[in-house]
A protein has these predicted regions:
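Non-catalytic, conserved peripheral segments adjacent to functional cores
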Residues: 2-116, 135-138, 142-195
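Conserved metal-binding segment of the jelly-roll/cupin
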Residues: 110-132
Length: 195
């Protein structure tokens, strides 16, 4: 296929599902296009996502198997995650007071083979377990702001997450996160968060 033909090849919109567990979370199931050279996957398009969010920064993290990162949450920032290498157990928990899904937890496996993307709105706590060595890529809709980088305990029984690991490695920061019941009113997210 010529370079011009490749560019003009019409690609359908991937399957984008609203989570039935947590409001405003979207799971993207992209189409894969392959030929003798390999595979092409469109992983992000701004028009796919709700809330009029525009991603402004791309980040990449690499973790060894056995690590848990999180749970983190933001009052203002949305995230979009993909896992181009390895396998992650993604854990999401709705912390938003007033949300019809407040208190719900969603766990899903995201990896290079299924190529899923996960849109995470503000107020939804998020983390992942490295089931293998992995690379996680994430787009965010605001620049890093330490005052909007909050956390909740990854092992809180009220969250009841299945991380898929028995003895994970965590950062000191993530080990010190408070339980959901101990979050102060000033850091508890609310439904319909906007910038």
């Amino acid at each position: 296929m010529s370079r011009t033909a490749w560019r003009s090849y019409a690609r359908p919109v991937p399957t984008i599902e609203q989570s039935d567990r947590i409001n405003d979370v979207c799971i993207v199931k992209p189409d894969k296009y392959g030929d003798e050279r390999g595979v092409f996957i469109e992983t992000y398009r701004r028009s796919w996502f709700p809330l009029g969010r525009e991603m402004v920064q791309a980040n990449r993290a690499e973790r060894q198997a056995g690590a848990v990162v999180g749970l983190h949450y933001h009052l203002h920032q949305a995230d979009y995650w993909t896992v181009p290498r390895g396998r992650a157990r993604v854990v999401l928990h709705d912390l938003r007071a007033g949300s019809p899904t407040d208190g719900a937890t969603l766990c899903l496996d995201v990896d290079a083979d299924n190529a899923l993307g996960v849109f995470i709105p503000p107020g939804v706590a998020h983390g992942f377990a490295s089931l293998t060595d992995l690379t996680i890529s994430y787009l965010v809709d605001s620049y890093y702001n330490p005052s909007d980088e909050l956390g909740v305990a990854w092992d809180d029984p009220a969250i009841a997450a299945d991380w898929g690991l028995t003895d994970p490695v965590l950062s000191a920061r993530d080990q010190a996160n408070p339980r959901r019941a101990d979050l102060g009113a000033n850091v508890r997210p609310h439904a319909n968060l906007r910038r």
